[in-house]
């Protein structure tokens, strides 16, 4: 529900400004591409969170289960890559991608991080290791972030510059965003410290002393 509502709406928002957005990104398929990308990056974020949490709380990391998640993401990434390429070809914008402009170079970097690197990692034996899974997740997540930033900043930079203006988030926008991330992180620490989410399961911390050590560490942070 969240991806379908939020991501589709975010993609639809830019359909109303095709003359302001660079043609590389200005497509009628944008809402669907936003939704699809959120579907396959979701497992990437889950993989990063799972590895960090299990390492942090001294729990066993199920690499086989995580590899299954990468398989799902890799298939959707391949579909996204094909759809994106077909859209560029049909709109006659493929040449702009390889024109060595800022927009073209940023788009290539976006696709490499979002699709190419994760798919290659998944196909290699390295993709079944903890390190490979972590790189898979980080690449996909960074690629999605760059995708959104390219639409907001890179894709509209030429139009804004033509009007003699510029855009950069205000101090309050930056602080409020960082604050939301910190609030979510502190809430996560509080929940894991005060509710039995991780301990008491085979493969978790083996002794009460380990649990107390984790508790003291988190208390120091909070």
Regions found by a protein language model. Give the residues of each.
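Central hydrophobic cores of alpha-helical transmembrane segments
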Residues: 132-143
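Extramembrane terminal tails and long inter-domain/linker segments of multi-pass membrane proteins
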Residues: 157-167, 177-222
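Extracellular/periplasmic helix-loop-helix junctions in multi-pass membrane proteins
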Residues: 23, 93-100, 126-133, 152-172
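Long, contiguous internal "core" modules enriched in hydrophobic/ aromatic residues
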Residues: 1-127, 143, 202-208
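Hydrophobic alpha-helical transmembrane segments in multi-pass integral membrane proteins
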Residues: 81-84, 145-156
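Hydrophobic alpha-helical segments of multi-pass membrane transport proteins
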Residues: 115-122, 147-151, 180-192
């Amino acid at each position: 529900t969240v991806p379908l509502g939020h991501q589709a709406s975010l993609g639809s928002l830019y359909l109303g400004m095709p003359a302001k957005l660079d043609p590389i990104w200005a497509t009628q398929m944008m809402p669907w591409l936003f939704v699809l990308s959120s579907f396959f990056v979701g497992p990437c974020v889950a993989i990063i969170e799972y590895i960090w949490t299990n390492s942090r709380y001294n729990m066993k990391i199920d690499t086989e289960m995580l590899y299954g998640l990468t398989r799902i993401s890799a298939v959707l990434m391949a579909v996204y890559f094909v759809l994106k390429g077909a859209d560029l070809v049909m709109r006659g914008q493929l040449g702009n991608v390889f024109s060595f402009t800022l927009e073209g170079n940023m788009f290539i970097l976006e696709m490499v991080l979002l699709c190419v690197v994760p798919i290659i990692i998944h196909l290699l034996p390295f993709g079944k290791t903890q390190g490979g899974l972590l790189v898979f997740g980080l690449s996909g997540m960074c690629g999605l972030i760059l995708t959104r930033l390219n639409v907001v900043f890179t894709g509209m930079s030429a139009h804004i510059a033509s009007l003699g203006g510029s855009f950069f988030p205000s101090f309050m926008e930056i602080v409020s965003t960082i604050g939301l991330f910190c609030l979510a992180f502190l809430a996560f620490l509080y929940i894991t410290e005060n509710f039995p989410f991780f301990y008491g399961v085979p493969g978790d911390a083996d002794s009460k002393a380990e649990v107390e050590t984790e508790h003291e560490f988190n208390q120091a942070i909070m």
